Structure formats: C-alpha cells, structure tokens
Amino acid sequence: MKGFDKKYQDFPDFILKITKQIWEGKDVESIAKFYTDDIPVISPFGITYGNKPVIESTYKTLKEFPDRQLLGEDVIWNGDDKNGYHSSHRILSKGTHLGEGFYGKPSGKEIYYRVIADCACRDNQVYDEWIVRDLSLIHI
C-alpha cells in the first residue's frame, strides 16, 4: 500500500492495529500521527474537526473507563493506492465505569456496546471518519 508503513500487511491490518495501539496500548497521542490535522469526525453527537478533539475525547473516555477496550471484530473495505482506502469496521467496546464524566459518578458497572466506524484513509492516515455507537446498551 503506497504511503503506508510497511509493518501493515494490508488495509484491514492498518485499521485494526491503529485501533489497538490507541486504545489497548493507551497510545492516545498517536492519534496525531494517524488522524489528519483537519479530519472531520461525524457522529450522532455532531461534527468535530481536527485530531485534537479526537485526542481530548479519547482521554476523557479513558478517564471514565480506564480499562476500555475496542476489540475489532471485522473490517470490510475497498480502495487502491490511487484513490485511497475506505473501511467500515465493527468493534466491540467494553470497559468498567470507574471515573466521573459523561455518565456521572463512577458506578463500577461493566459496559459492552457495538461501534461501527467508517474511515477514509491515505498515506498512513485517516482523513475522514463517520462513527456510530449503540449507546442504548449502556445502563449505568
């Protein structure tokens, strides 16, 4: 894959490994490397622009759910070196509510929910992301 680090076997490998590095590896600052400076991230909560809001949001989530894991289950994708790559990947998100934040005071409850993230990528970076989380499963 032109423009991507040689350590990735293919595009799904890139998507799964950067997700693991950021969340399980707690390498939040690597978002600045893997997400473009002006990336739009579109979700049911609205649109943010840039990798800095993604980094801030990730730190807030890890404060509230310090053991949070994003377990990549499947990646469907298409693309090529000329036009870039697009993925849609399904994730199982799990963690324990141990910190205060969006969901209030720590409850100690374990949560599990699904996420679908669609990413457009080129040159070892995500430049557009659409994400939806099934938050209806969270009862804290």
Residue ranges and their predicted role:
Residues 1-138:
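C-terminal and inter-domain tail/linker signature
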